[in-house]
């Protein structure tokens, strides 16, 4: 017996009911963070004053820098009616989280610090208002190592990094990176010059 021709395809049936939602998948990897770079361009000149306290700080921007204004009562005021070079702050365009800060300093003049030690720090200051008054961000300080001591040639290097931070950075907050020096030992009044650079990671 011969098989007859194949008949026409029937109409498509009604779509079945949607099945239950599957289990939630594993959390994906954390997205890449933004890196904000800082470089002094010309050398900074940091000073310490009587008692080994912070004297003149250095403000560092994106390839430029300047001697900073005095830190009075923990506050830096950038209003500066004199109009000199002081505004090295940047503004956050979105909310984020600061996760790490690294900093570096290389001397550009020989130093004799026999019996004395100079410690350099880099601190992130913020103005959340935002306005021209900046205060240090808690936890956002890098102490550079090794400290400067003894007979130092040009190109002596100190550096440091702080990781594992979880510092909220809200949109429109202004941030300012400030290098300072403190001293201990025989000579408490000092000047140290050098190139400074740093970077902060913001998720």
Please report, for each region that a protein language model flagged, where it lies by residue.
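Collagen/collagen-like triple-helix recognition
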Residues: 1-37
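Extracellular jelly-roll beta-sandwich "head" domains, especially the C-terminal globular C1q domain
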Residues: 29-203
């Amino acid at each position: 017996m011969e098989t007859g021709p194949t008949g026409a395809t029937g109409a498509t049936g009604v779509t079945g009911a949607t099945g239950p939602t599957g289990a939630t998948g594993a959390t994906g990897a954390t997205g890449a963070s933004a890196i904000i770079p800082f470089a002094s361009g010309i050398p900074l000149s940091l000073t310490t004053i009587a008692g080994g306290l912070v004297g003149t700080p250095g403000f560092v921007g994106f390839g430029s820098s300047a001697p900073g204004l005095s830190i009075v009562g923990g506050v830096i005021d950038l209003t500066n009616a004199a109009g000199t070079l002081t505004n090295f702050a940047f503004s956050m365009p979105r909310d984020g989280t600061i996760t790490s800060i690294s900093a570096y300093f290389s001397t550009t003049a020989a130093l004799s610090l026999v019996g004395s030690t100079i410690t350099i720090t880099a601190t992130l200051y913020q103005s959340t208002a935002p306005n021209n008054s900046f205060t240090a961000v808690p936890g956002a300080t890098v102490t550079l190592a090794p400290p400067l001591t003894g007979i130092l040639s040009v190109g002596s290097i100190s550096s440091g990094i702080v990781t594992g931070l979880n510092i909220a950075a809200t949109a429109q907050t202004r941030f300012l990176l400030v290098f300072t020096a403190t001293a201990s030992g025989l000579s408490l009044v000092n000047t140290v010059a050098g190139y400074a650079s740093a970077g902060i990671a913001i998720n």
